[in-house]
A protein has these predicted regions:
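HhH-family (HhH-GPD) DNA N-glycosylase catalytic core used in base-excision repair
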Residues: 1-184
Length: 184
């Protein structure tokens, strides 16, 4: 278990920002975050983050993932000084951080995001992960056994492209296949 004080972070704002689509919400301010072949249980209590990882895992993976090296206090302060509109935006989104996610997953979710909404994008990401990704089961304290699917590699998507119709991607299927072919 790793605990850290972090100002200017709000897990609920990040979850609803349209920046992440694979987080599993357990309840307000408590999530499971799949990342590669592992998952992190994280809970926020005001400015305190309680994470199911070791100190070493935090600094190897999650420090960068949550952009802990950036001074969000200064960014927020600078944005507030621009004008009244930016002040309102800075107040409303003061807990959002730029997450350092897997690049391939970000490219695919960006392609999925055309002409749709956040719940639909989440459903498509989950469906692609279930059809083409690797299933993981993990026991987590207070959560029990949780099943999640690793976001697939471009090779895994191409190997399973005949199964993508189950994902209900529509015209996005050809875009995803084309992107995977370009990457491989």
């Amino acid at each position: 278990m790793f605990v850290i004080q972090v100002p200017y972070i709000n897990l609920d704002q990040i979850y609803e920002s349209g920046q992440v689509f694979s987080w599993i919400k357990l309840r307000d301010s408590k999530y499971v975050i799949p990342f590669g072949n592992q998952a992190l249980k994280i809970e926020q209590q005001k400015e305190r983050l309680i994470m199911s990882c070791t100190d070493e895992q935090f600094y190897e993976i999650w420090y960068n993932y949550f952009d802990m090296g950036t001074d969000y206090l200064e960014i927020n302060y600078s944005a507030r000084r621009i004008d009244e509109y930016m002040k309102i935006c800075a107040n409303r989104g003061s807990g959002v951080r730029i997450l350092h996610q897997d690049l391939f997953e970000m490219i695919i979710t960006f392609a999925l995001a055309t002409a749709t909404n956040i719940p639909r994008i989440k459903a498509m990401v989950e469906s692609i992960s279930q059809v083409c990704g690797i299933e993981h089961k993990q026991s987590m304290r207070e959560v029990g056994r949780i099943t999640w699917y690793e976001f697939p590699s471009p090779e895994a998507i191409l190997e399973n492209q005949d199964k993508l119709d189950k994902c209900k991607l529509g015209y996005r299927k050809d875009i995803i296949i084309g992107l995977c072919q370009d990457i491989v």
